[in-house]
């Protein structure tokens, strides 16, 4: 089959960029087109143009909590490289979406602010944290966010209050409404955080999760009142492997890439887990975003 002629854009782009380099899973084939976004105006220009030609695009940050297809992405990938933070009055901070969420938690604690201790060790960007309402059993970002600025599909700047974000367990309005999350204003408290407390949170994560191995984080949402990891472990699936993909022997709600895992191998493990738990009357919903090779136009996208 003859390869389609390359498209022409009114801005510089890269072609056939492998997404495994931009994934904490280290899985994913090439994107048709790829562009790192460094400024607000750049984001507006690119999004406005892609929307005008009805071309599918995907927004990524640190590449956590998502699984790219081995074939890649048959569209345009925008890599969020808008970094930075501003300390405001009354213990508020404005954080730009490309910034590492864990790094933000560390920086705020260092500067004498409390409220983001739970961010220690959480992979992903600030934009991804908003997109997924990231958190732990202790807290999540909904407890501190006050306002979020975005760029909609027409390239317009938008602003949402915390009530308008529709934040719930690992979810937000952006799961159904495609927008480029630009920044978040967080309300913290001026209180010196114990370094030991932050270290203990991170140490617990290191001891209980495969933090140093390629993964996308927790695969499934926790059913109400219980833990997906415990259910998978009790079903005898911990450690099960298909090819280079393995249900983590350390935490059963993680699938790790032991070397050369493919997206199909990961999806096979996900299907086995779901079908096994289904026989026990338990429906597990996956928390990670499974990004198809051929996307639907203007479908919800990953921001992590």
UniProtKB/Swiss-Prot annotation:
Signal peptide range in chain numbering: none
Keywords: Cell cycle, Cell division, Cell shape, Cell wall biogenesis/degradation, Cytoplasm, FAD, Flavoprotein, NADP, Oxidoreductase, Peptidoglycan synthesis
EC number, as in UniProt: 1.3.1.98
UniProt domain FAD-binding PCMH-type: residue ranges: 26-191
Pathway annotation: Cell wall biogenesis; peptidoglycan biosynthesis
Subcellular location: Cytoplasm
Main EC class the enzyme belongs to: oxidoreductase
Any one annotated GO CC term: cytosol
Family annotation (HAMAP family): MurB
Protein name per Swiss-Prot or TrEMBL: UDP-N-acetylenolpyruvoylglucosamine reductase
Organism the protein comes from: Chlamydia pneumoniae
Taxon lineage: Bacteria, Pseudomonadati, Chlamydiota, Chlamydiia, Chlamydiales
């Amino acid at each position: 089959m003859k390869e389609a002629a390359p498209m022409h854009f009114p801005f510089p782009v890269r072609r056939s960029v492998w997404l495994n380099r931009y994934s904490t899973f280290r899985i994913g084939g090439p994107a048709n087109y790829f562009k790192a976004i460094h400024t607000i105006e750049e984001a507006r220009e690119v999004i406005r143009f892609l929307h005008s030609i009805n071309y599918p695009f995907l927004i990524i940050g640190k590449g956590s909590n998502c699984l790219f297809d081995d074939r890649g992405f048959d569209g345009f990938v925008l890599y969020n490289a808008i970094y930075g933070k501003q300390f405001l009055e009354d213990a508020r901070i404005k954080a730009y979406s490309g910034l590492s969420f864990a790094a933000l938690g560390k920086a705020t604690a260092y500067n004498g602010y409390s409220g983001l201790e739970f961010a220690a060790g959480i992979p992903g960007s600030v934009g991804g944290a908003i997109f997924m309402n990231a958190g732990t059993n202790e807290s999540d970002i909904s407890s501190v966010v006050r306002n979020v600025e975005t760029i909609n599909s027409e390239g317009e700047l938008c602003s949402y209050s915390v009530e308008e974000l529709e934040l719930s367990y690992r979810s937000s309005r952006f799961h159904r409404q495609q927008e480029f999350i630009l920044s978040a204003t967080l309300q913290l408290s001026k209180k010196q955080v114990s370094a030991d407390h932050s270290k203990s949170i991170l140490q617990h994560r290191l001891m209980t999760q495969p933090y140093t191995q390629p993964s996308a984080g927790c695969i499934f949402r926790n059913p109400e009142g219980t833990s997906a990891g415990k259910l998978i472990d009790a079903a005898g699936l911990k450690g099960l492997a298909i090819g280079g993909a393995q249900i983590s022997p350390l935490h059963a709600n993680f699938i790790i890439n032991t070397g050369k895992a493919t997206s199909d191998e990961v999806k096979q493990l996900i299907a086995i887990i779901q079908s096994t738990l289904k026989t026990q009357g338990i429906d597990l919903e996956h928390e990670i975003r499974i990004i198809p090779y051929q996307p639907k136009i203007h479908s919800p996208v990953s921001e992590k």
